Design a protein with these regions (language model features):
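Short, small/polar-rich loop/turn modules that mediate ligand/substrate recognition or access, typified
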Residues: 169, 174, 246-248
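Short C-terminal tail/terminal secondary-structure segment
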Residues: 88-91, 142, 235-236, 247-261
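Alpha-helical segment proximal to the catalytic Tyr-Lys
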Residues: 122, 166-167, 244
Length: 261
């Protein structure tokens, strides 16, 4: 589908792998110019000359200002901001999560988005238009006990997006969320990653454990975990003028988890 994104300037955080990398690929296919921010943005930077890869730690307080300033220096505008960067550490219990761990997770998952929005919004307002798409999660609505701080951070993202949509809609800025369910990013397949953890938990081979997780544990109506491309396409839709009357929304890309809850 033509999302009418040719020459749009798109900033994507966490663009180096998983959903962020798939989103970069999707925007490039639509003709956009991408600024890819990540600790290691090399995979995104190798995709095309239309990608400006910025190696940056989005959890640092000045990272967002730097990324947006570089975007303005290179392109003179910012049309789309995709808040994607984040981590989802497994927690044995709420009681096992220290203050330091709470602060670290919230700083990366939530405050990075706060700072990125604050840096990008003045330019979008001056332009009279802009689109912000923030990646939340199905557990932002229905928390997972093993990802307690992650769940809270994504609930906060949902409210941040809605608040921005209300205040800045009159200025021509739209703000929406995409809430993925289980999505098979590299974190599932790296040694010692989520796939191996599931295999150890259920006493199965990794592929069988992932299938069991989807069908029997999370009970996805579609009975399989999603792919990063599934999420990326919805992000591109929400960033485009095809969705010009959509703001303050949360699109679930979860295989039916929320519907079945």
């Amino acid at each position: 589908m033509d999302f009418q994104l040719t020459d749009r300037v798109v900033v994507i955080t966490g663009a180096g792998s998983g959903i962020g990398l798939a989103t970069t690929q999707t925007f490039l296919a639509e003709g956009a110019k991408v600024v890819a921010a990540d600790l290691d943005p090399s995979a995104a930077g190798e995709l095309s000359n239309s990608v400006a890869a910025l190696a940056v730690d989005m959890s640092s307080e000045d990272a967002a200002d730097f990324v947006i300033a570089e975007t303005m220096r290179m392109h003179g505008r910012v049309d789309v901001l995709v808040n994607n960067v984040g981590a989802f550490p497994f927690r044995e219990s709420f009681l096992a999560v220290s203050d330091a761990e709470w602060h670290e997770l919230m700083n990366l998952n939530f405050y990075s988005a706060v700072r990125a929005c604050r840096a990008a919004l003045p330019h979008m307002i001056e332009q009279g238009r802009g689109a912000i798409v923030s990646v939340a999660s199905d557990v932002g609505r229905a928390p997972d006990r093993f990802f307690v701080d992650y769940s809270v951070s994504k609930a906060a993202i949902l409210m941040l997006s809605k608040a921005i949509s209300i205040e800045f809609g009159p200025a021509g800025v739209r703000s929406n969320c995409v809430s993925p369910g289980p999505t098979r990013t590299p974190a599932w397949d790296r040694p010692g990653g989520f796939g191996d953890s599931l295999a150890a938990e259920y006493g199965l081979e990794k592929e069988a454990a992932i299938e069991y997780f989807a069908k029997e544990v999370r009970k996805l109506p579609l009975q399989k975990v999603g792919d990063p491309d599934d999420v990326a396409r919805v992000i591109a839709f929400l960033a485009s003028d095809v969705s010009k009357h959509v703001t303050g929304a949360d699109y679930t890309v979860d295989g039916g988890i929320v519907a079945a809850a």
